[in-house]
Structures are given as C-alpha cells and as structure tokens.
C-alpha cells in the first residue's frame, strides 16, 4: 500500500518538489530499483483474458514467467538509455507488517473466489481483474529473477527487510542517484530522490526531490513521518476521521502524533458531553511509535559497506536459463541483444565495456563468495515463454 493518498497530497501541497522527465534524462545515472514492486507489476501486466480462460506466461513446469519477461525488458530499456540499474529485493518483512499482510492475504482469497465465479459466468474482463488481484510472488519466482538479473550482469541486493528502505539508504550514501518504485513510503524512509512511472517508454517519469518536498511542506523529517503514519501506512491502522489534508493541518498545529492524540481526546470528550458521536476513532492497536521507529531507523545494510560490482553478462548461461529452462524464444533474446548493439556500431561487447567500465553486481554479504565467481562473457537478451490457462 505504501502511504495512502500521499502522491495526490504532495501534488496539491508541495507541487514544486515534482519534475516530469523522459527516460533519456537519466542516462549515465545509477538507479536503485524496487524489484519486488516491479515483479508484481509485470505479473499483472502479462496476464490476458482468453475466450474462456485467463492466460499467463509460464515455463514448461507451470511456473509463471511474466515477471522475468518484464524485468528482462526493463533492464534492456535501462541499458539502451545508458542507465545503470541496481535491483533490490525485499527480505523478511517486519513483524509490524503482519497485520497488513494478513489483510492482503484475505483479499487475495476473496479475489480467487470472485475469479472462479466470473469464469463460470463467462465474464472474462471481471475474471481478469479479479485474477490480477490474486497475484503473489513465490520463492521460486524470486530466485529465478535474481538468477536472470545476475546472469545479465546487474547488481542484485537482497535487503534485510524492506527494499524501499535499502534503496533509500543507498541513495543517501551516494551509491545510487534515485530510488525507482511506486511505493511512496520510499520518501518516508528518506530517499533523496524518488522516481515513479517506469511503465511505458513514451510516458514521462515523475521525479520527486525529498529536500524540496520537506522545504515546501515546512515540516521536519520526524513530522513528515508522523504525517505519513496518519495518512495510513503498512505498519499500523490509522485514525478514522483523519485524511491527508486534516493530518497535515493537525501536524502543523500540534507538531506530533502525541500532540494530536491529546487534541483528539479533548474533541471526542466534548462531543460526548453533547451526546454526539466521536469525530475521530483511534484504533485499539495504534502502533504509531513502533511504526515511527521502523521508518526512522529501518533494518538495512549500510550503504557505505556495500560493494557494487557490474559484471559483463554471461550470455551462454543466460540463454541456457531463459530458453531451455524458462521457455523463452531464442529470437526474442537475440532481438534483445540487437537492441543494445544498434546503439554502438562496434557491437554489443564494446558498448557494455564502455558502459560498465570496471563492473557491478551487488552481493549480499552472506553469499559473497558464491556469487563473486560469475562467468565473464559478453552480452545481453530479451523475453518470451509458454502460456498457462486458468
């Protein structure tokens, strides 16, 4: 979920923190990409409605591959435009997120029932919509994505916890230019630059500058965190009766959630005297202090301690993995290689050598030995796969 309605709120209250830019603006930049968020997007985008069934891309064993298609093409798109992607995956979710995860699981189960009902009724558009809401990422899908990206020579980080928090840490450490994610809580984790909208080639990308945002809102970082918690985040329930606009006014006046809670208590007590319903409803488990702590001091690997290494793509093993194991069409991969080669008459290899210089793959400290011995060949590919009917 990220932070509820934060994007719209910032457009209204801090419009000067936004810029809309085309992809080629970021040439030469290193961008930290929220891989888990991107995988969900790609899995949803690669589903389609047949006459009587929902169709998904899969390998010969039935494992979904839409996320690989998307990550592969997105990586090629970045490389074509001179952008260095660093892919960051979620680690173990914080305990504070268990309530939100349980809520999402319930919604997915409900969507599964609605999918089956829509299929029985022959309403394929409704079936597709509901099936998209059942999307989950399995451990196999995550492992496949990591393997493919590493074979492509890209840096891969497995965060200890939240990917957005790890990206924000890398950005503050100067290891990357920006965090690319649709989750607005990257700002709550204090990423200096947030990029949203890497969906199509032709649409502009939103760049949000944290310092400009804070300056225009006239808030401290701690107050902004409290604002985000009041808007609604993944770690606690929110106070009913307080939306983003009201939250902002209250933070400006009372400075913190503690001050606002005192105000809420007085307002509700006064209304009770007048036999009126309470204006605000504070949840019984309003874990704002724990949520605040998680945003301000998240579990991350220190940016200064991470070694980033870009390697040349291992084309032979990449082709073997995508074609033989995952059912990609060889022509799709070769076409992907050509997309890069077109940018440099001298060919794909020299372009990558010029682009990567002395190389980047990010290695989790616990797996550094195993992953450091990557084969050093020369190239890079693109999509395809089987189809699975639901």
From Swiss-Prot:
Keywords associated with the record: DNA damage, DNA repair, DNA replication, Endonuclease, Exonuclease, Hydrolase, Magnesium, Metal-binding, Mitochondrion, Nuclease, Nucleus, Phosphoprotein
A Pfam short name: XPG_N
Region of interest (N-domain), ranges: 1-108
Binding site residues for Mg(2+) 2: 183, 185, 234
Ranges for region I-domain: 126-254
Cofactor(s) named in the record: Mg(2+)
GO cellular component: mitochondrion; nucleolus; nucleoplasm
Predominant location category: nucleus
Annotated Mg(2+) 1 binding sites: 34, 90, 162, 164
Positions of the UniProt region annotated as Disordered: 359-390
Entry's EC annotation: 3.1.-.-
Gene3D superfamilies: 5' to 3' exonuclease, C-terminal subdomain, 5'-nuclease
Protein's GO biological process: base-excision repair; DNA replication, removal of RNA primer
Location relative to the cell: Nucleus, Nucleolus; Nucleus, Nucleoplasm; Mitochondrion
Subunit structure and binding partners: Interacts with PCNA. Three molecules of FEN1 bind to one PCNA trimer with each molecule binding to one PCNA monomer. PCNA stimulates the nuclease activity without altering cleavage specificity.
Protein name: Flap endonuclease 1-2
Protein species of origin: Paramecium tetraurelia
Organism ancestry: Eukaryota, Sar, Alveolata, Ciliophora, Intramacronucleata
